[in-house]
Amino acid sequence: MNMYKLAQPVITDEQGRLFIENDWHPGPLPRNIELGEMSYPDTAYSFTTFFSKRPVGLKLGYASGNYGHSSFTTGVYGQITVGKFVVLQGIRMICNHSITIGDHCMFSWGCVITDSWFTDDKVFSREQRRAMLEETAKSYNRHLEFTDPKPIIIEENVWVGFGAIILPGVTIGRGAVIGCNTIVSENIPPYAVAVGAPARIIKYLEANDSEEVKRAALEEFAPIPTRKINSD
């Protein structure tokens, strides 16, 4: 695990395992996650269903935060990459392939991002549901097998509202806004505002998130002089 100064104090035990100090959950953080400088992992409870065996199963970028007991559920091949200055507020990620999130994104309570779904060849008769559940009960981790995971890409500066669901194979373009309880099953273009179930585009926003606009916004919302933070 690559380590820098985090936004939470952490301790290492004699076995080299990393714990968040004063975490209410007793478990350690997984060894194959990469926490960027000033990131906020919140609690080890978020990783109780994290089974990735990838060298880096999760990367949490500079100053990004996991809040409100978000959960990261991964299969052995799952890989989650989160950029800089991202807010994950009480969401759930389900990843058996890859989920990639760009810088400056916000996710509200109850969002679900899943790159895994049952494909059309799964038949849901009562008998097959019963057999599937009984077979799953024999698994040591009670893991249902998904047959066709597809990568998800969420580009920079996307805002996802309360309770939205993002389904496998979706790309959400830069600067888009996804409304509360929206179900996204198809790609969303940059700067689009999408709402509904299924998602429909109701308008497009002005592409005004350039570096110059960001600096002006920081000056407006942070009038007190602040020292420059190097996030490279």
PLM regions with names:
Residues 178:
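Binuclear metal-ion centers of metallo-dependent hydrolases, dominated by the metallo-beta-lactamase
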Residues 1-157, 162-166, 174, 190, ...:
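Domain-scale signature associated with acetyltransferase and cell-envelope carbohydrate enzymes
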Residues 163, 181-182:
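Active-site-flanking alpha-helical
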Residues 170, 182, 188:
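Short beta-to-alpha loop/turn elements within the nucleotide-binding domains of ABC transporters
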Residues 62, 183-184:
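Short linear motifs in intrinsically disordered
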